Amino acid sequence: MRNTLKATTLESKLPLLAVEHGCIISKDADITVAFEVALPELFTVTSQEYEAMHGAWCKAIKVLPHYSVVHKQDWFVSERYKPELQKDDLSFLDRSFERHFNERPYLAHRCYLFLTKTTKERARQQSNFSTLCRGRITPKELNHEMIVKFMESVEQFERIINDTGYIKLRRMSDDELVGTDKESGLIEKYMSLSMEDVSCLEDIDLSAQQMRIGDKMLCLHTLSDTDDLPAKVSTDNRYERLSTDRSDCRLSFASPVGLLLPCNHIYNQYILIDDHDENLAKFEKTARNMNSLSRYSRSNAINKEWIDRYLNEAHSYGLTSVRAHFNVMAWSDDAEELRRIKNDVGGQLATMGCMPRHNTIDCPTLFWSSMPGNEADFPAEESFYSFIEPAACFFTAETNYRSSLSPFGIKMVDRLTGKPIHLDISDEPMKRGITTNRNKFILGPSGSGKSFFTNHLVRQYYEQGTHVLLIDTGNSYEGLCNLIHNKTHGKDGIYYTYTDDKPISFNPFFTDDGIFDVEKRDSIKTLLLTLWKAEDERVTKTESGELGSALAMFLDKMAKDRDIVPCFDAFYEFMRDDYRAEMANRPIPIYKQDFDIDNFLTTLRQYYHGGRYDFLLNSKENIDLLGKRFIVFEIDSIKDNKELFPVVTIIIMEAFINKMRRLKGVRKMLICEEAWL
C-alpha cells in the first residue's frame, strides 16, 4: 500500500558512521565510548555509601574535557521469569517452587553509560538543527589529537568509578553495540525499544500527535527547566515503606523514576560539559544587562539576583558550571495502559519534588538524541544550567537483586517484584571479604517467619550435600524431617524427641565403622563424668584418668569380642565385674578417696537395665549419627529436666564434633532454635 505521509529510510537518517574498537563514531565526527554499568543492589546501600558514589561521579565527570556529554541511560523493561525445570536433580519442592513462579512478571534493569566528545558548535545547536531534520548528513573528519586526549580522560573516568568498590564500569565491545548475525546489538535494541536478543524491525512514526515504534506508543516526561526542579536535592532519601521509627531504609534520590516505577521505561540522565569560564563570563554579562534594565522591570532585578547567587556559588565553592537534562521515556502497546503510565510517571516525579512536564513536542528529537552514540545531537534548549554536584543527585544508584555466581546457595525472591533469585549467603560473602566466617544469626519477633525461613534454608542446604544438625524447640522441623525420612526410606532424617510412649534414647558406644578416635573417647568420658558428678563437684585427675583407662579397656575388649553388644549396659557390667577385679589385683592399690568405683556404679545404676533411665543410653536402633545428614533433636519437653538435658546436650556436642573432625571437605551446619541467652 502506498504511504501518503512523508517517509524516509532509517539508513539515510542514521547519524552513526561506524563502530570501531568499542567507540561509536558519528557522521559529525563525534566519538562515543559505551560502558555497561553494574550498580549496587536495592536496599543494600547506606547513606554514607550513597554519598561516596555521588562523590565518585562528580570527581570522574571533572576529568572530562570541555564539550563532552555524560549520558547515563537506565532501561527498565518488563520481563517474565523462566523456570529452570530442565535440571535433572530438582527435588519435588524445588520443581514446585519453579512452577509456582513460572511467568512471574518483574522489572529487569540494565544500565549503560555513554561518554561523548563533541565540538562547541554541536554542543550549542538546537532541535531544528538535529540530524533528524537534515536532508542529508555530510561526514566530517576526526581530529586525532582530540581523540587521544579524550580517550585518556575516559580511562581516568573509568578508573575513578571502579575504584569506589560500589560501581563497576565494563567497556562494551563492537558486537555488543552493533550486534552479530544471531544477536541484536544495543543500537538495534534501542531503535525497537526491546531488550530481546533477536529484535524485530519496527516502523518509527513521528506524527505530531504521538510517537510510535511499531505497536509501542511513547510518552515523555522531561526535566529541562529550573522551574520544574525541586527546591532541594540530596544523594539519597528515606524510603518510608520499609523504614521505622528506629531504622532508616535509604534509596537514591532518583529511585522513584527507577525501579519504583513499575512500567516499561528508559530514564535518561544528561550532563553536558561546556567551557566553565565561558559560561561564567556569559552570566556576568547577563547580570550586568539585567542590572541596567532593572529600573524598567522588577523581574530583571530578581533575575540579576539569581544570577549573582549562581556566580557566588561557583566562585565560593569552586563548583563547575554544566548543563543538565533528565527525561523519562515510557511506552506501551495499549492506549489505556499508556494513560495509566502517564499518571504513574507524573506521580513519581512529584514525589521527588519535581513539576511533572509531559513533553509531546520534543519526543522525536529527544528519542533521537538518546540513541547510543548520538548524544551530541542533544537540543541545547532542552537543558538547564546547574553544577555537577546537584546534577549528579539525579543519577539512579541502585539496581535490582542479582543471582549469585556461586553454584552453592538457596532460592529466594526479589523483595520488590517477587522474582526468584539464586543467593549464596555462605561462600560468596567470604570470598568478597564481606564476612570472615559462615555463622548466621536469625533475629525477629514472634510470627516473623524465622522457623519458616530456616526450614527453607536447611532443606536446600541438605539437598546440596550439607550435614544438618538441628536443636529444636516446638517441633518446627518435624515435618521436614519426616519428609526426608520417608524420601530416603528411613536411611536419613533422624528425629529425636521425648514422649512417655517413646522416650528419647541414644547409644554412644556404637559406630558403624567401629572407630573410636580421641574426640569420640573424650566425649564418652565427659558423658560418664557428667552422669556421675554433680555440677558443683570437682573431678580429680585420678578419677578422669581411671575412667579413661576403663573406657579404653572396654573398647579394646569390644573390638576383640564381637559378641559384646555395644551399649551402656555392657560398659556398666564391664566396670562392675572386669574393671573392679583388675583394680583389686594391681600392685599399687587404688583407694576410694582417689577413685570410688562403688559410688560410680551406684550413681549410674539408674541408667542400667531396670533403672529409671535405662532407656537413655541403650538404644536398640544402633544409629551412627556420623553418616546421617539430617538430624533433629527436639528438646522442648526435657529442657528443664536436670537429669536428661545435660546428657542430651553432650550427645549433641559429641555428634557434631565427630562430624567436624572426621568429615573432611563436607559442609556441616549446626542450628540452635530459640537460642536465648
Question: Which residue ranges define each predicted feature?
Answer:
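Extended, folded cores of ATP/NTP-driven motor/assembly subunits in large transport
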Residues: 1-398
